[in-house]
A protein has these predicted regions:
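Membrane-interfacial amphipathic/re-entrant helices at transmembrane-helix boundaries
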Residues: 1-20, 48, 55-62, 128-134, ...
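Membrane-interface helix caps of multi-pass small-molecule transporters
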Residues: 26, 51, 76, 80-85, ...
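Loop-to-transmembrane alpha-helix initiation sites
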Residues: 13, 90-91, 118, 145-149, ...
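Transmembrane helix-bundle core of multi-pass membrane transporters
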Residues: 89, 93-96, 100-165, 195, ...
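Alpha-helical transmembrane segments within multi-pass membrane transporters and channels
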Residues: 58-98, 256, 260
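Helix-loop-helix "hairpin" substructures at the membrane interface of multi-pass membrane proteins
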Residues: 142-219, 223
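Cytosolic-side transmembrane-helix boundaries in multi-pass membrane proteins
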Residues: 177-184, 188-191, 263-313
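Transmembrane alpha-helical segments in multi-pass inner-membrane proteins
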Residues: 204-279
Length: 313
């Protein structure tokens, strides 16, 4: 029973983080931009969602959309620092991530009667609604939650696929892989980079908002390690489905997020006190990187042998 509950919890967490992984897929894989500001936009989405639900009493779906807008704005700032002010990608992301630490902490003042800052805020006892208020309990609640989260991930995955299939999506991909193509068409590649970073951080904020509603609490430190989590998800998904051309990259990334979250949840069974959880997380990520490198070499050798065999024939 413990293993089943751990698996179901891992699936729920995986779907929460799948949207985050989709955003990082845009910034890292498509734009080739090391966007560390994800560690800041994830909690930004959570605190904006919490403030909207607590202070404005707006519907949970609208709170998620407003969180997307806040994350997209932060991503736009990262893009402007890089494109317009010529700051390196890594430093641009670090600047925004650092600034967001203060922004998110300042927004928590709206959650307290005295206006003081807080790092943790619980939804319970405040009559706040969430996407998962279904009046269910036990396995029925877990199943319904997984269904809602799966539908959300599927929606965002399809939206990305549709967008990347448009002319603007083609320009976005070209801006990351070969900006000269964009320039040759009379367009500014920098503007498409800004757009891509806005989308990526918007998705990160959505993930933070959904995660906050799922856990029924906001934690100002929730963004810690989310870049590692998302990158691991992208690497796992892209590696596992590299040879299956019928599987879209967005699908692979989402599945990678679920697999990685399941692995993290199973690690909790090993370290019940949670003391070494971050260490185990780091070791797992290192193993994924090494495994991905070895898998790439193996596939390269197999491809070379096939080519050699075809040439002899």
């Amino acid at each position: 029973m413990l293993f089943l509950n751990t698996t179901l919890d891992g699936l729920q967490m995986g779907f929460c983080f799948a949207v985050l992984a989709l955003g990082v897929y845009i910034s890292y894989s498509i734009l080739d931009f090391p966007d560390l500001s994800v560690d800041g936009t994830f909690p930004l989405g959570g605190v904006v969602c919490t403030v909207v639900l607590f202070r404005l009493n707006l519907p949970p779906v609208l709170a998620v959309l407003l969180s997307f807008a806040a994350g997209a704005l932060a991503g736009t700032v990262t893009g402007l620092l890089h494109v317009k002010l010529k700051i390196t990608p890594l430093l641009s992301a670090i600047i925004v991530m650092t600034a967001l630490l203060s922004v998110t902490l300042a927004l928590t003042q709206l959650l307290t009667p005295g206006g003081y800052t807080t790092t943790i805020f619980s939804y319970r006892g405040h009559g706040m609604r969430s996407l998962f208020d279904l009046g269910l309990s036990g396995m029925a609640e877990k199943g319904a939650t997984i269904g809602i989260l799966f539908g959300m991930v599927l929606l965002f995955k399809l939206l990305i696929d549709l967008f990347l299939g448009t002319r603007m999506g083609y320009m976005l991909r070209a801006a990351g892989s070969n900006s000269r193509v964009v320039v040759s068409l009379g367009r500014d590649a920098g503007n498409y980079k800004i757009l891509g970073l806005a989308l990526a951080n918007g998705f990160s904020a959505v993930s933070g908002a959904v995660y906050t509603q799922y856990t029924m609490s906001y934690d100002n430190t929730s963004g810690s390690g989310k870049v590692v989590l998302a990158l691991a998800s992208v690497i796992i998904g892209m590696s596992l489905f590299a040879r299956l051309r019928f599987v879209r990259n967005t699908t692979a990334v989402a599945v990678g997020a679920v697999i990685y979250s399941l692995c993290l949840n199973y690690l909790v069974l090993v370290d019940t006190n949670g003391i070494y959880l971050k260490l185990l997380n780091a070791v797992l990520f290192a193993l994924i990187l090494v495994g991905n490198r070895q898998l790439s070499r193996l596939l390269g050798r197999l491809k070379a042998k096939r080519a050699e065999g075809g040439a002899r024939a």
